């Protein structure tokens, strides 16, 4: 009996591992709402080619990209609305190669871009706001200019730890966090109940627009502080806030990570 139980446990563990590996790429994708195209999966790569200008893809098995895996949008200058159906946040640990296409990813449970995750696109939008048919029709009319409305009641978070390279980025969720990684773009729009930004991550951004219902925090390491000419939250000079008077808590602070940064901080105090 003991040997059998061990075999059952081992079999379950192996099957669970195989199941998780099998679903590390987007699953169950179908073009809907009158749009069309092809979705081809080969090994660790999904290739998507739309046949029109605006496309809607509903992913019945969720939208995730595992480490060392990739999703490639092969067209140029097109718009793709990806709607993920899953019980947890979409995890981007691999490569989302959008080229100069505009990529929208909607998952009410959230979107997590991991440390190994990379995204390239003309415009990238991640949102936790559920979309109804009227919203989708609006996307089909507006294309790249479409932006989901913020729903304060949804608890899904948008968190970035990876690298995003796009001309325009829009992140909408309960809590929007840009904690690590690198973001290179012209315009960054953040909207949520709470917005947390590491200023060092967005230092190359030309324009940042934030809207928060409850709290805004801009954090900056001492190293980044030094690189930005001893200006705390140098990127904050690029921030503009919608309805900023409604924000209950507004904070800017510098952080010290190790002994090297302590020394830099001490040198700064001596100079003062």
Where are these regions (language model features)?
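Gram-negative bacterial Sec-dependent N-terminal signal peptides
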Residues: 1-23
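N-terminal leader/targeting signatures
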Residues: 8, 15, 221, 235-237, ...
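Short, intrinsically disordered, low-complexity terminal segments
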Residues: 10, 19-21, 227, 254-256, ...
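Solvent-exposed adhesion/ligand-recognition segments of exported proteins
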Residues: 21-243
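Aromatic (phenylalanine/tyrosine) cluster motif
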Residues: 225, 239-241, 253, 265-268
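Short, low-complexity, Pro/Ser/Thr/Gly-rich segments in the mature regions of secreted, periplasmic
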Residues: 257-271
């Amino acid at each position: 009996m003991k040997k059998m139980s061990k075999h059952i446990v081992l079999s379950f563990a192996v099957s669970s591992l195989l199941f998780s590996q099998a679903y590390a790429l987007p699953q169950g994708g179908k073009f809907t709402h009158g749009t069309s195209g092809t979705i081809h999966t080969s090994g660790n790569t999904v290739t998507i080619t739309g046949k029109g200008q605006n496309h809607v893809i509903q992913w019945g098995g969720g939208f995730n990209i595992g480490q060392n895996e990739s999703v490639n949008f092969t067209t140029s200058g097109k718009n793709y609305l990806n709607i993920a159906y899953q019980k947890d946040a979409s995890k981007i640990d691999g490569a989302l190669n959008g080229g100069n296409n505009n990529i929208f990813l909607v998952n009410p449970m959230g979107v997590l871009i991991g440390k190994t995750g990379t995204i390239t696109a003309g415009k990238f939008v991640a949102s936790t706001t559920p979309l109804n048919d009227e919203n989708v029709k609006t996307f089909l009319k507006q294309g790249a200019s479409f932006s989901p409305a913020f729903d304060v009641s949804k608890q899904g978070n948008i968190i970035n730890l990876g690298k995003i390279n796009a001309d325009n980025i829009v992140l909408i969720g309960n809590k929007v966090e840009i904690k690590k990684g690198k973001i290179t773009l012209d315009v960054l729009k953040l909207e949520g109940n709470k917005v947390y930004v590491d200023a060092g991550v967005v230092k190359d951004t030309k324009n940042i627009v934030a809207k928060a219902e409850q709290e805004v925090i801009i954090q900056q390491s001492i190293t980044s502080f030094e690189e930005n000419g001893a200006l705390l939250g140098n990127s904050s000079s690029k921030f503009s806030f919608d309805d900023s008077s409604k924000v209950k808590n507004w904070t800017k602070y510098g952080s010290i990570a190790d002994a090297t940064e302590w020394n830099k901080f001490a040198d700064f105090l001596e100079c003062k």
